[in-house]
């Protein structure tokens, strides 16, 4: 409700990707500048949820939720499609390092281990809601326009892979489901696409 997400979905995704890339791999000074810019934007964003509950983008609890949902999804994808045997100690290291970015944005009590992340997500479940707006956004994402004809199939695969990575309870809340056949198509398909993408950015 506070951006041009619906009109420029790819642009919104690109800006988010640039922020994540810069704060993860960029110079400290550049990361700090981006974080301050995002914090300034957050201060201007407020509204009401569908049930009338007020919210602010700068709310520390909301910032923690967004961070944990994002990072746990990244980890789930990494474990499935890149390093299934990644040691728990390395997973914990990722969460510890990523938590610094969340804290700099204003998040509080950010979990810093895989066990703490799992506990946090479980604790948040009673507060989560799926409504018409939630389903609208999910539908928009699943039918997102591709930047080119060649990108249509890889894009569709990636979106279905996202559904496949959801915890069962989250998929049920959103009314999203992949059949066994779809999973057998999506997983090897994403492995193939990922190899091409990795080669293209080397």
List each language-model region with its residue ranges.
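Mature, function-bearing regions of proteins
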Residues: 1-65, 69-202
